[in-house]
Amino acid sequence: MTEIAQQLVSIITKRHPCQQDLGDEADENVLEESSEYDWLVIETALDVVTCLSVALGPDFAELWKVFEKPILKYASSQESTERSAAVGSIAECIGNMGEACTPYTSGLLKLLIHRLSDEDPETKSNAVYGLGLLCEKSNNEHEILKSYMNIFQRLEPLLDDQGQARLLDNTAGCVSRMISRHPNNIPISEVLPRLVQLLPLREDYEENKPIFKMVVQLCE
């Protein structure tokens, strides 16, 4: 597993032999074509990282120590495609690690909150999804709760964004996860009717689960 992790990191950080520069003598068209595949190789490595988190579950937290820095770097890239893929990978890893993500709460929280202001809808949607999972899974309640209202205030306007179906669905799921974990820290009477109005979800049907879980929990 260590060898696999090292190979993945070398790809993500562009140090793998398959990513070596073709040199000055390479044809310009070849270089251009090569650059188009550079990101595909890295994106595939990110997919493998996500698959490892699925396979290892909580045990993946040890490997995240290795992947965190290079993946977070892409999450702050100037390229929206790179940001979106990195933030999406981070979100999936949080969900798969479960409460084992707790030691990484501070850094992940800071990044994901920052990406709520991203100009790219896909990146923003992935950040919303990741934040919901972090609020749900992390046991670092002190760190999470001191940012709760800040997160909610940033999410609330997104509940009215009918133009971005996936972002709207992820926002509904995120707020529902926040309510389920800490119901006393969200104005439920104000937000619950708005969440109900968003049903049925239009694109990300997986987010139905946290919404209905939250409703059932409130009724118990």
Language-model features: where?
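Karyopherin-beta/Importin-beta family HEAT-repeat alpha-solenoid scaffold
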Residues: 1-220
